Amino acid sequence: MNRQLFVCNSVYQVLVAMWIKYIYHQREVSDLIISDHMNGAKTLTENIKKTGIFDQVYYVESSAFARHKILFDRKQRIMMSMCPQHVLKNFVKLNAKYTELYMANVDFFSQLLFDALAHQYSRLKLIIFEDGLFTYSRLYEEDYKST
């Protein structure tokens, strides 16, 4: 069974992730990570949990890491490349095995997350989604297929 993990750094990305979930993965289990890259991220996380759209919703403080503000010594860099899942636990403890990872930004945290999940499931699909909501509309899909 497929299980998706969405990573969102903005309110609009959360909206797009909800739309993708609703249109393409309505009957599948999907989880969501909301990062501290935006104001009000904790409140947004709690509100999204209440909707029940996603099975698990995680709040992650990753902005300093994503923006290179955390410096690593040689041992830590080796640990990140050899055991990324161990380093990931400093940010979020994920309890599932994912088949698909959706993200709109590629930064240090996203790379760490992908590496850690790929260690668990070697056929992990990485899907980079864009912020354009219309792209995921059935109307757009029908129009695209007709041309």
Predicted feature descriptions by range:
Residues 1-3:
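Short, Lys/Arg-enriched, disordered terminal segments
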Residues 5-147:
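Active-site and donor-binding regions of nucleotide-sugar-utilizing enzymes
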